[in-house]
């Protein structure tokens, strides 16, 4: 509409994501790193490692209701609120977020290593075990 178009003059509005040389170079460097450093393959491999480990934890712990996600984007649905689990994970050196009151959210960097996945799975096992003992489940 002409009245909206007339509200600003040329040059008054710009975009952070505009095609300037610096942002284009940064975008190219990021895409190059993703492809040349094998980040997609690592995401798939580490996601599968997480999934297998989490399924084992689900078999062991009745507090875990469901595991879902794709690649490294994973949700762990619990039968109870996750606040105490999050605090316990911090004590174990793992920072994790939640989605809703009862879902732990795992969204690590694409460069995550096997030892990091192992550490997270171990910490989850410890913290969930303590929480089950506390709740007597």
PLM segments and residue spans:
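Conserved N-terminal phosphate-binding loop of PLP-dependent enzymes in the Aspartate aminotransferase
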Residues: 1-137
């Amino acid at each position: 509409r002409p009245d909206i178009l007339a509200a600003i003059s040329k040059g008054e509005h710009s975009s952070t994501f505009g095609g300037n040389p610096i942002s284009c170079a940064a975008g190219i460097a990021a895409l190059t790193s993703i492809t040349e450093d094998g980040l997609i393959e690592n995401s798939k491999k580490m996601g599968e490692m997480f999934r297998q480990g989490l399924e084992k934890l689900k078999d062991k712990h009745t507090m875990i209701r469901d595991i879902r996600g794709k690649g490294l984007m994973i949700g762990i649905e619990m039968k109870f609120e996750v606040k105490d689990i999050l605090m316990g994970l911090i004590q174990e050196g793992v920072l994790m977020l939640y989605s809703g009151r009862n879902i732990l959210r795992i969204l690590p960097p694409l460069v995550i290593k096997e030892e990091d996945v192992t550490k997270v799975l171990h910490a989850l096992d410890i913290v969930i075990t303590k929480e089950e003992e506390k709740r007597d489940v």
